[in-house]
A protein has these predicted regions:
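N-terminal export signals and maturation junctions of secreted/periplasmic proteins
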Residues: 1-13
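Conserved catalytic-core motifs characterized by acidic clusters
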Residues: 3, 68-75, 111-117, 213
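Active-site-proximal cofactor/substrate-binding loop regions of enzyme domains
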Residues: 10-82, 87-92, 96, 100
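Short, contiguous alpha-helical
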Residues: 30-72, 116-173, 233
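Hydrophobic alpha-helical segments and helix pairs
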Residues: 89-137
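A glycine-rich beta-turn/hairpin centered on an aromatic-Pro dipeptide
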Residues: 162-205
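Acidic/His-leaning functional-site neighborhoods
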Residues: 193-230
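C-terminal interaction segments
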Residues: 219-267
Length: 267
């Protein structure tokens, strides 16, 4: 299903790049501000979640874990005390990212280890951590009121990975809301309007009896089309941008798009 045009080395690099950009978004922001796209979190909660996830993945990769690692077994998982201030939080984020990137590089692609997914290797974690950081950086930028931008290839890969995750959830958790994304032959077309010629920027998602199928192709006859610049398209697909407004355009049956977005979840 996935394109996965990005290399393992690129993912390793992005762990520190995306963390650095996240730290920039947090610098000087009110860490007690609520995150509109994750309303149960403050900005500090988001930072601790991301930093803890980074250290958790690092521990799995570093130890070549054969089973899930509990949070309490991860050094400094919970982050520094609040009273230590934003400088300590920033340093903790930076150190965790550097350690995770180093562990991934040392492991190399395809190294066998536990994951919660269909792919039991370091390659899964390199990609998953990159996209975890990218999307939560968007959350942080929205909360801090600063601009968010993403490389088009990285944003397209975020869409690809999300589709893989939703398909996996359908297979292993059939009672999950994602299980309702099947049947009827309805189609959802995603169209990045700023994609360069030959670049990956279109997805045709078709509901089938077994779930859904994805093809990288254009159509003018989809049940609904979501279109816009690649970054905004990705954010809307991840429910980080509203479907109203000027950022993206919906053509066709909006209710089907909303049906998809409400059920394309996991966790």
């Amino acid at each position: 299903m996935t394109q996965r045009d990005l290399s393992y080395d690129r993912y390793c690099d992005e762990v520190t790049v995306q963390t650095g950009l996240l730290r920039q978004a947090l610098a000087g922001a009110d860490l007690q501000a609520r995150v509109p796209t994750c309303p149960e979190w403050t900005l500090r909660d988001l930072a601790v979640h991301v930093g803890g996830a980074t250290r958790w993945m690092n521990e799995i990769v570093r130890t070549r874990a054969s089973a899930e690692v509990p949070d309490e077994a991860v050094p400094e998982f919970a982050g520094p005390p609040v009273e230590d201030g934003p400088g300590a939080l920033d340093a903790w984020l930076a150190e965790g990212a550097e350690a995770a990137a180093e562990a991934l590089r040392e492991a190399g692609p395809g190294r066998k280890m536990w994951t919660w997914s269909w792919e039991q290797s370091s390659s899964f974690w390199a990609r998953r951590l990159t996209q975890e950081l990218l999307v939560h950086r968007a959350d942080a930028c929205i909360a801090a009121g600063v601009p968010f931008a993403a490389d088009a290839e990285l944003a397209a890969d975020a869409v690809d990975e999300w589709l893989e995750i939703v398909a996996y959830v359908q297979r292993v958790q059939p009672a999950d809301p994602a299980g309702e994304l099947r049947g009827g032959g309805r189609t959802l077309h995603l169209h990045a309007t700023d994609a360069a010629p030959g670049a990956h920027g279109e997805w045709l998602i078709e509901l089938t009896d077994d779930g859904f199928a994805v093809r990288p192709e254009h159509t003018d006859g989809a049940t609904v089309e979501l279109r816009g610049p690649m970054t905004e398209l990705m954010l809307a697909f991840y429910r980080r941008l509203p479907l109203t407004g000027d950022a993206v355009e919906v053509r066709g049956d909006r209710s089907f798009l909303e049906f998809w977005l409400e059920r394309a979840t996991f966790g």
